[in-house]
Structures are given as C-alpha cells and as structure tokens.
C-alpha cells in the first residue's frame, strides 16, 4: 500500500512539472540553431522576425541611388546582418554563404517631445528588404526579397535594377560596404574591395 502511494505521488509530481514547463516559443533560427535563410515551399523567404537582435551595421537618411521624385518626407534606412556573417566578415573581409542583410525603412519625425531640430526615427516601419547570399540556390549567388508584412519575403526578379546596381557599385561582393563605417576599414585591410568599386573611386 505504501509503495502504491509513493508511485501515485511521483506520477502527480511529474504531471505538475510537465504542466509548469514553459511552452516553446517560435524562433527565426533554423533547425541547426543558426540564423541561416529558411524558404517557403513556393520559393519565398521566411522573414527573420528577430532581425533587430542581430548586428546593427549602419543607418542612412533619404539615401537614393538614382533620380527620384521627392517623397515629401524623410526616411531612415537601418541595416542589420546575421551574427554568423558579421563574425566571418571581421575575419575575412567578405560575406560567407548564408549571409542575410536586412534593410529596415522607418519614417523620420521632426516634432516630438523636446526635439527642436533635426530628425528622429518613428515607430512606423515603412518597408523591409532582405539581401540573401545562397550560392547553391541563386544565379549570381545573391537574391533580394521584400516583405510588407514582416512574415514572408517575396523574391524579386533577377531582372530588377537592384541586382545590376549592386553588382556595378557594391564595394564588397555586391554589397554597399562603402556605407558601412565599421566594416569599410576591415574590407580595406583585407583587400576585398571589388574591381568595379576601386575603378569608381579612382575616377572621382
């Protein structure tokens, strides 16, 4: 009888512990635990929702790589990269396979709190883009995705201007490292600037 009560007590304790265990939360990492790209069945990208926990690279204000209409308001661009790729860049001066660079666009504000001049970033996200390096998957090794909902990144056609622009002007491996102040010196030290970028700089 005593043994039966012990078994029942152990069973109840196990049940309580199981119910108290935290529910696993959704993660943007893949099954291996790395921040590598994960794709949907139709070839799009599962947007890395926790990208703001990645490495911050740079910000720009009202940047444009060609003539465009005045939007009537200012915009901030923030760039983040997955930690694995960042660490590899520091060692080699270039991006490894499975690199993901996220460009986040936010509205700029000028009137708020005690601010009297200049601009600050608002909470309104206007757009998200992801530049993915997947050598086995994409022609040219890189691809662009855009995400309106922050859930799915839609693959952009290789015919779009962003591909040729990055190939012709990117300082390192089709990426605009020339605008990443903490990485520009690394690329210079490792001698990884593209021929196109060096030619462009020499012509200034």
In which residue ranges do the predicted regions lie?
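Positively charged n-region of N-terminal signal peptides that target proteins for export
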Residues: 1-4
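Bacterial N-terminal signal peptides
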Residues: 9-20
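Generic N-terminal simple sequence motifs
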Residues: 18-20, 44, 177
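Acidic, aliphatic-rich amphipathic alpha-helical segments
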Residues: 66-68
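Short, structured beta-strand/loop micro-motifs enriched in basic residues and often containing a Trp
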Residues: 74-86
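Bacterial Sec-dependent signal peptides at the C-terminal "C-region" and cleavage site
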Residues: 18-30
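Sequence context surrounding c-type heme c attachment/ligation sites in exported
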Residues: 27-31, 37-40, 47-55, 59-64, ...
């Amino acid at each position: 009888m005593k043994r039966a009560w012990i078994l029942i007590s152990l069973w109840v304790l196990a049940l309580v512990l199981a119910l108290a265990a935290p529910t696993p939360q959704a993660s943007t990492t893949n099954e291996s635990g790395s921040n590598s790209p994960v794709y949907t069945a139709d070839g799009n990208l599962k947007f890395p929702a926790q990208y703001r926990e990645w490495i911050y690279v740079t910000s720009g204000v009202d940047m444009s790589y060609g003539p465009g209409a005045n939007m009537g308001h200012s915009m901030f661009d923030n760039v983040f990269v997955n930690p694995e790729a960042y660490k590899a860049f520091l060692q080699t001066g270039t991006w490894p396979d499975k690199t993901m660079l996220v460009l986040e666009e936010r509205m700029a504000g000028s009137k708020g709190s005690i601010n009297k001049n200049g601009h600050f970033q608002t909470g309104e996200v206007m757009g998200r883009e992801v530049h993915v390096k997947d050598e086995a998957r994409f022609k040219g090794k890189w691809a662009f995705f855009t995400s309106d909902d922050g859930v799915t990144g839609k693959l952009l056609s290789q015919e779009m201007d962003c591909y040729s622009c990055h190939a012709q002007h990117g300082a390192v491996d089709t990426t605009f490292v020339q605008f990443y102040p903490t990485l520009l010196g690394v690329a210079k030290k490792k001698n990884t600037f593209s021929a196109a970028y060096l030619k462009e700089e020499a012509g200034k």
